[in-house]
Every structure is written in structure tokens, then in C-alpha cells.
């Protein structure tokens, strides 16, 4: 039993509003979970003999959660970055066989060890900023063996590092060249057949897809989600990034955990997400990298009570970003989110976007995933740029 005391505790408890800050707070950890939290002066006598750790007045938040990444991939797309700056659009690059497909070639060619060696430094950068839970998608293999290879690497990341990894099946990311004239065949023979195999092997925690004019239609994704439901797998969707195809509303009707990107989200989608409790995951790194001008409908999302999360969207083409702290600053600066909304977006709401009910808040019964910071006010996490004030990570009650 551990007692962390002399701390400012940022509980992110929804009922408290804002940060849920407890000044001069203490919390007790037993068996990897929070058993008590409150002002230090209110500490129950039963915890008096706990092993004490004085945090020196530091700030403690829930461990950060990056709920949308593509962090396992082969190669890089630095040349594509140059092409965009020379005037080529995301759609033009994709239709010319670049974009996602260039990462597909490199990922197919790489073995598991090479993919793991490339992914771990990216993961370590996130962990160094207080991340304790991480989502990792497939989506750069686009054949069954390569997609499952990516998910095996993702599972190994969780074994080799002190971080919870949630894996997502994203075979419906793009059409590979060998199926360019057989969309139905790809969905049947790779997306669905691979989903069944990956589920049987215990590699899939959720199912995702890219609903866009350059990817998959709303109707195609609905069929994929119907199959995921038969397997008992939750779903999420890349939606309304480049146009409004009604993907978010469709995903919400399927009970999606989240709909992500959402720059072109319309009122129908907002209302459907509010009704289903689907989280809006905003990805300012992609917005920034692509130099987009269409903003997510922040005011309408707030008014409807849609929970809003933030994530890095770490990927080689449109968001080569491995800083959740910078993502928070982008959420505030680009999308006009408040600092408390940004912190909720990488804790409480990010946990909800992954279907995790045991983290993202500092309340009794929650998993003891914590980040300890050398700052005095939680707004500093969003306000400061290029600054990492992490003092320590605590994962499942263990200091790492």
C-alpha cells in the first residue's frame, strides 16, 4: 500500500467540473488501483501506516492516453512532405499511388523485428511525456498477413514497455493495387476474413475504417461494422476529414466508440454522436500538417454535449507527430479548446474513446496510472510549447 502526498491532484472527475483540483492532496494505491483520494488532512486512519512518497507539491494528473495512432509502419514519407509543399494535395498524392500506398510497400517488405525497432523510439517519445495508454492501428499492410504482422508488433510494444496498448483492425484504410478493380473482393477476402482471423488470434480490440471519397463508402463501412458486431468487436471510424459523407452518423448508429477527424462534420452527425455517446476524436496534427482550413465544429459539439478527445494521429504521411503535449497546444491554438478541455481530451475522454472505464480519472477504483509533473498549474501542460515537465510516470501503481 502506497500513500502519495504533498501533491496537487488533478482528478479530471466529470462531476467536479474543470480540472477537479485537490490542493494539498493525497491518494492511496492498493493492488495497482486508487483506493482513496482527497485532501491530506482528511486521510483516514486506516492508511496511516502506508508507505509514503512525498511529491513535493508537484502536480499529479491521470496518465495521458493517446487514443488514435498509426505508430507501427515501415519507411517514411519525407518526400511526400516536400510534394505537398510544392502544391500537391492529399487526394492527388493518394490517387497517383503515393500516400498510404507508399507506406504499404515499405510495411509489407519489413519483418516484425524491423517494424518493432522502428516503432519503439516513437513510443518511447510518447511515454517520456506521461503517456500510459496507447492505441495502435494496423492499416499499412492491406493484406491479411501484413495487417496481422502489424498487430503482433503492437502487442509486443505493450509487452516490452510499461504502457497499455489497445489494438485496432484498420484493413479498411485504402484499396491495395491488387484489388483496385475489386472493392467487394477486398472487403470480403481481406477486411472481413482478416478480421475473423485476427479476432480468433486475440489480436484485435476494435475495428476502424476510413470513410472518404478516396477510401471506403458509408455503405461499405456499415457492412464491415455489421460483421464486427457479430464478432463482438467495438467500432470506430475516420470520418468527415475531407468531406461530409455521413460516416460519423452511420458510425454512431452502430454504437461506435469514436468518430475521428471530423473537420466536415454536419449537424446530423453531431446529433447522432450525442445520442450514442460516441466520442469526437480531434486530430490537430493532421489538420496542421495538411494545412487545412476547414475547422471541426467545436461550438456545435460543445452545445450538443459530445465528449471531445485529442490524439496525435501519429503516422508517416499526414501527422508525423509523437508529442501529446504539443497536440494539446494545437487543440487550444487551432481549435479554440480550453486547457481543461485539452487535458480531458487526453485523459477522461480518450479513455472513453477506447472503451476503457478504469482510467482517465483520479477517483477510487481507477487503475493507478498517473503522471507527476514539475509544474504548479495544469494549464501549463497546454500552454507551454516544446517543454516537457514530466517528473515521473506511475503505471498500475508502479513507478517507472
Curated annotation (Swiss-Prot):
Cofactor: binding details: Binds 1 zinc or iron ion per subunit.
Record keywords: Cytoplasm, Histidine metabolism, Hydrolase, Iron, Metal-binding, Zinc
One cellular component (GO) term of this entry: cytoplasm
GO molecular function list: imidazolonepropionase activity; iron ion binding; zinc ion binding
EC number(s) from the headed UniProt entry: 3.5.2.7
Binding site for Zn(2+): 68, 70, 238, 313
Function statement: Catalyzes the hydrolytic cleavage of the carbon-nitrogen bond in imidazolone-5-propanoate to yield N-formimidoyl-L-glutamate. It is the third step in the universal histidine degradation pathway.
Organism classification: Bacteria, Pseudomonadati, Pseudomonadota, Alphaproteobacteria, Rhodobacterales
Cellular localization per UniProt: Cytoplasm
Pathway involvement of the protein, from the record: Amino-acid degradation; L-histidine degradation into L-glutamate; N-formimidoyl-L-glutamate from L-histidine: step 3/3
Organism: Paracoccus denitrificans (strain Pd 1222)
Cofactor: Zn(2+); Fe(3+)
Gene Ontology BP annotations: L-histidine catabolic process to glutamate and formamide; L-histidine catabolic process to glutamate and formate
Name of the protein in its database record: Imidazolonepropionase
